[in-house]
Amino acid sequence: MEKNLYSMKGKVCLITGGSTGLGSYIAHGFLAAGASRVYITARSKDNLVKKKNELEKISDGECIAIKSDLSSLDGVNKLVSEIRAREQHIDVLVNNAGIGLGTPIKTMKVEDWDRTMELNTKSPIFLTQALLDMLSKNATLE
């Protein structure tokens, strides 16, 4: 039982912000644990391709890189369309994409704050909402 608890065998996963940092480590862990397909998304195509090639070497699972900008609802909808065209269900969604301004409050611009809020708070909610039916197909209580 305990061994199966951590198995990702046959799972389909989507990780936003999956090309670097925490998202890339999560993708690595899922593939190492037997996930069949792990989708990683990010804004940088170069980072995505590099990470995809790196991750596919560690397991028999497939890593699929999708360039996407989730800082707008249009970007969220484009990603949802892409996933729906490829999959019937998703087992795991990791809303990891995010940015931090690092700008002193004195010089912060409204546009930068709005973009941060779109990506960090609005996009995860509406991405999850748009994929709920796909997530619930194989949902379990565990």
Where are these regions (language model features)?
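Active-site loop of short-chain dehydrogenase/reductase
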Residues: K11, H89-I90, L135-E142
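A short, exposed helix-loop element centered on a Lys and neighboring polar residues
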Residues: T128-Q129
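The beta1-alpha1 cofactor-binding region of Rossmann-like NAD(H)/NADP(H)-dependent oxidoreductases
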Residues: D46, K67-K78, V110
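Conserved NAD(P)H cofactor-binding loop of Rossmann-fold oxidoreductase domains
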Residues: N96-L101
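Conserved glycine-rich cofactor-binding loop
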Residues: S19-G21
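Substrate-binding pocket helix/loop in short-chain dehydrogenase/reductase
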Residues: P104-I105, D112-D114
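Conserved glycine-rich Rossmann-like NAD(P)H-binding loop of the short-chain dehydrogenase/reductase
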Residues: A35-K50
